[in-house]
Structure formats: structure tokens, C-alpha cells
Swiss-Prot record:
GO terms for biological process: dTDP-rhamnose biosynthetic process; lipopolysaccharide biosynthetic process; O antigen biosynthetic process; polysaccharide biosynthetic process. It comes from Escherichia coli (strain K12). This is dTDP-4-dehydrorhamnose reductase. It comes from the Bacteria. Pfam families: RmlD_sub_bind (PF04321). NCBIfam families: PRK09987.1, rmlD. InterPro entries: dTDP_dehydrorham_reduct, NAD(P)-bd_dom_sf, RmlD-like-bd. The gene is rfbD. NADH binds at G10, Q11, V12, D30, D39, F40, A63, H64, T65, Y128, K132.
Length: 299
């Protein structure tokens, strides 16, 4: 089985390289690949990659994820998040391939306090959400064999993440202010990759699982409580911090070009039932990531 992975060097793409390898022959690209086009600013190029390789499975971990930047470059965000996804969907349909694609809770308006269902009405607050929703719709229209996983608050041990930023600031400052009115579940790239690999195996044997799913860790937190956990674990590990006061503030304290949803909770019952998996609490993955961070690198 040939598996084509786009976006191999991103947070999720990096973990997918590990998780997908046992499933078959993994062919992975990113924007800099030269043998074939992996650059999503070239829709026809990535479609030609699909037609040339003729994979059984396509996993798309490439996206324009700079939420604030998307507000000032909506055409580019649309090109990456929707136009190229449509091109891949059409090419995948031609060669009979499955497409696994990642989307976001930002397709929702972010109000209320109930976890969003796959069937809830969408109403994006920003350009990023609009373009990701357009990508979803294109894939649904042009390639029946698809799995779309909406996720949120994604982190990974590789590269920058919220926890690393908080730890750096807590070493430099005695007081920090963190938002406490946005709710979601920090979800590890490791978890997304492992769930994706399992879902692919299920889909190959049960094609009727094709469709849209919500995929995040269990439980709910705020950025403030997330930060508090990071600092608690750091102190347990003997990491010296200058911080002595953590303040909770509303979203309005940090104005940004793109509006953020207050409610990023996603209901994952459909995913857990269809793929016979249990999604662990968000703290499990975060504590594991922090433990690796504390024991393998200088923060």
C-alpha cells in the first residue's frame, strides 16, 4: 500500500511520518520537496503529484495555520487551505485514493458552552476558519472516500508550543497574565497521528466510515489553567521559575487581528464509536510532553 503524506515537517506531519510508516510504503513531501511538488501554493502541481504516484491513501497535514496573518492575506490562505485541497480531492477521485484531511473548530462561531457536534451549523469568525471550511466542502464534494478530522489546540514536543512559551516567560518574569475565557482541549500531534493510522486501517476494511469527525483529547480547560498545569509540573521537576503571580484575564486583554472563539469544545463521540477508540484526557498528553521536555532539553 502506498501512502502519500503532504506537510511532512509540520507538527502533525512529523508525527505522521512515525505513525504511518508501519502501514505501508510512505512517500512524504513538504513545501521544499523537489522530486514531486508538495507546495500547496501550486494546486496543479500537488494534483499532478497525486496523479503520478497514484497512492492508495493521501494524508494532508499541510495548511496555512497562521491565523492572524490570514486576515491580511486571505487569497493566499484560500489557495493553501481550499483551492489545493480541491485539486487533491479531484485527483484522488481519479486514482481511487482515500484522502485524510485535518480541519479546525474555527469553522464554528465559538459561542455557548456545549461541545460542538459534526452536524452543528458552521459560522467561522475569521479568514482561517472560512478557508478551512471551504477546504472541507471541496473534499466532501469531489472525493467520496475521505476522512476529515476537525481538531483544536494542537501542540507537539517538536518546535514551538504554548507550554514552551509559558516556561520561557516564567523564567524571565515574576508576573504573567493568561486568558481564562477560551475553552478547549489541548491535543497532541502524537495522539492525532496515532488515531489517524488506526482510522486508516478501519476505513480500508469498512469504507462506510467515510465522513467528518471531531478528534481532540478528552476534557476541557482554559489557557490559564493549561499554563497553571505547566508551571505546577515544572516546579515538581525542579525547574527554577521567576514567576510568583499568574493572573487570569479575558480575551479582550490581548487584541488580535483575527477573532478567536470562546468555545472550542468538540464532541468526539462519533469518532470514538466508529473507530472503537478511547481518547485520553488532555492532561495525559501534556504531562508526557512536559516530562520529555524537562528530561531531554534545556528549556
Amino acid at each position: 500500500m502506498n501512502i502519500l503524506l503532504f506537510g511532512k515537517t509540520g507538527q502533525v506531519g512529523w508525527e505522521l511520518q512515525r505513525a504511518l510508516a508501519p502501514l505501508g510504503n510512505l512517500i512524504a513531501f513538504d513545501v521544499h520537496s523537489t522530486d514531486y511538488c508538495g507546495d500547496f501554493s501550486n494546486p496543479e502541481g500537488v494534483a499532478e503529484t497525486v496523479r503520478s504516484i497514484r497512492p492508495d491513501i493521501i494524508v494532508n497535514a499541510a495548511a496555512h495555520t497562521a491565523v492572524d496573518k490570514a486576515e491580511s492575506e486571505p487569497e493566499f490562505a484560500q489557495l493553501i487551505n481550499a483551492t489545493s485541497v480541491e485539486a487533491i480531492a479531484k485527483a484522488a477521485n481519479e486514482v481511487g485514493a482515500w484522502v485524510i484531511h485535518y480541519s479546525t473548530d474555527y469553522v464554528f462561531p465559538g459561542n455557548g458552552d456545549m461541545p460542538w457536534l459534526e452536524t452543528d451549523a458552521t459560522a467561522p469568525l475569521n479568514v482561517y476558519g472560512e478557508t478551512k471550511l471551504a477546504g472541507e466542502k471541496a473534499l466532501q464534494e469531489y472525493c467520496a472516500k475521505h476522512l476529515i478530522f476537525r481538531t483544536s489546540w494542537v501542540y507537539a514536543g517538536k518546535g514551538n508550543n504554548f507550554a514552551k512559551t509559558m516556561l520561557r516567560l516564567a523564567k524571565e518574569r515574576e508576573e504573567l497574565a493568561v486568558i481564562n475565557d477560551q475553552f478547549g482541549a489541548p491535543t497532541g500531534a502524537e495522539l492525532l497521528a496515532d488515531c489517524t493510522a488506526h482510522a486508516i486501517r478501519v476505513a480500508l476494511n469498512k469504507p462506510d466510515v467515510a465522513g467528518l469527525y471531531h478528534l481532540v483529547a478528552s476534557g476541557t480547560t482554559t489557557w490559564y489553567d493549561y499554563a497553571a498545569l505547566v508551571f505546577e509540573e515544572a516546579r515538581k521537576a525542579g525547574i527554577p521559575l521567576a514567576l510568583n503571580k499568574l493572573n487570569a484575564v479575558p480575551t479582550t486583554a490581548y487584541p488580535t487581528p483575527a477573532r478567536r472563539p470562546h468555545n472550542s469544545r468538540l464532541n468526539t463521540e462519533k469518532f470514538q464509536q466508529n473507530f472503537a477508540l478511547v481518547l485520553p484526557d488532555w492532561q495525559v498528553g501534556v504531562k508526557r510532553m512536559l516530562n520529555e521536555l524537562f528530561t531531554t532539553t534545556a528549556i
